[in-house]
Amino acid sequence: MENTKKIGNLTELQCMTYLYGLGYSISIPFGNADKYDLILDINDKLYKIQIKHSSEYRDELGEAEYVKFKCTWQSHNTSGYTRTQYQENEIDYFATFYNGKCYLVPVNECANEKILRIKPPKNNQRKGISFLEDYIAEEVISKL
């Protein structure tokens, strides 16, 4: 991929295709002034989704350990660039795409970035750890 915009666009297409393939209606806002990338219609309730590209991180053996994405948006003004966290009144979920699946993470579970573990930490800590498998789109949607 040549640049981050193309990478982001590909992630958006992958998430949209995945969610549409599950049978859900998707609406895309006109322009790029909205904080969300799509509206997902689930049982006549609308959810604002912000799609983020996630990066994979590997352990010393080269095995996938976790994925991470930013939970902020960047804007530019006369002072330079600033990063701002998304708020619960702006979006409902972040979506990301990894290894052939779409994942949905509630905005209230995110701060500046979100780490989703693929395998447990070496110390086997579970408290305060988010596991990728807990955010598979179908599973999250089934609980709505």
Q: Where are the model-predicted features located?
A:
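Catalytic cores of nucleic-acid endonucleases
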Residues: 52-103
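N-terminal targeting/anchoring "stem" of glycan-biosynthesis enzymes
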Residues: 18-20, 98, 117
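Charged phosphate-binding loop/patch that engages nucleotide di/tri-phosphates or the phosphate backbone
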Residues: 110-144
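Acidic-basic catalytic patches of nuclease active cores, encompassing PD-(D/E)XK
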Residues: 1-29
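Conserved catalytic cores of phosphodiester-cleaving nucleases, focusing on short active-site segments
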Residues: 19, 38-40, 45-53
